[in-house]
Amino acid sequence: MKFSSSLPGSSHGSSAWLKPLLFVLVAAIGLYYVKWSPYYLKSFVAADKHSIGGSILANAPTAPWSAALEYATVYFLAIWKAAVLGVLLGSLVQVLVPRDWLLRVFGRAGLGSTLRGGLFALPGMMCSCCAAPVVAGMRRQQVSVGAALAFWIANPVLNPATLVFMGFVLGWHFAALRLVAGVLLVVGVSLIAQRVAQTETLPQAALDAVAAAEYEPMDDGRHFLVRWGSKLWQLFWTTMPVYIVVVLALGAARVWLFPQVDASMGNSLLWIVALAVVGTLFVIPTAAEIPIVQSMLSLGMGVGPAAALLMTLPSISLPSLLMLRKSFTPKVLMTVALLTMLIGAVSGLVAVVLL
């Protein structure tokens, strides 16, 4: 059965809007504190100094355990506020936003729903790991694969603040490449993964949920705090432990993942592909790819590998893929990872020709 506009509407009256408005208020306050205000101030730093800080990969200890602890400390100090906000919003979207509303906007498997997922991500400006809990919450409300993936990938890849930083620090030609390739990545990967998931028709369970939403109260008889606490714990337990463990593992692995950069790391296809693969799996805070690439370019890296890293480092990561292991099938996640590597490598080749 196909998803259609005949889905029943939500209950009328001002009370139907109170909980969604509360969700918007929490999201706006949280994003202002965690993202909008700090990034607004950082844009002036980027414009004035043509830098937003040092590379998070610099001066790595040679011992894997020391490298793991050092990287995890720096990483989590940079992202913990956004991670808390992501878990908070991922739980609240399940108890404050009516499921039938979400399905009307994001429920259909198609281009329109995918584009809306990408557009709704733009104010979030989160890294892939911090956006993952929100995506998990959306998927538990039966949001389509394409829309959920577009929301997830667009958060870091099409981050407006990152594009501005990139223009001031690396040059607007890099920012333009990131924008064009980013749109192709968000829309193309999401639509292809949607096809792989074979969910062009809405699951019957989702249709039943929408029908029930017209007649059953959103609170299912339980107190709001009880329902929210349950969703919050489920989301935390299924995403955060694996997140912490894999960040530690990648922190240790950076000793081998990122070799010493020098002029010999030119624009060869081997380096472009290798760094597209590494960039897809590695995890970084929001916008950290900019100082990483700036540092590597200063040491002699070619524009091809640099562009591959600019596309893949923020897009997804091994921790975020594992955080969403219960939200998407392994086939979908593998498709997303491989296509991200491919687009990263192609972006590197385009950069060699155009930049």
Q: Predicted segment positions?
A:
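Intrinsically disordered, low-complexity non-transmembrane regions of multi-pass membrane transporters
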Residues: M1-L25, L41-A63, Q198-K231
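Membrane-interfacial helix-loop connectors
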Residues: A121-L179, L257-V332
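Alpha-helical transmembrane segments in multi-pass membrane proteins
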Residues: A78, A82, G86, G90, ...
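Juxtamembrane and boundary regions of transmembrane helices in multi-pass small-molecule transporters
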Residues: L18-F23, A27-L41, R108, S113, ...
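Transmembrane helical segments that form the transport core of multi-pass membrane transport proteins
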Residues: L69, G86, L96-F106, L225-V303
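Alpha-helical transmembrane segments of multipass membrane proteins
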Residues: G90, Q94, L185-A193, V246, ...
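Membrane-interfacial helix-loop-helix
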Residues: L96-P123, A209, G221, L225, ...
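Helix-boundary and loop/linker segments of multi-pass membrane transporters
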Residues: N59-P61, F76, L103-A109, R140-Q141, ...
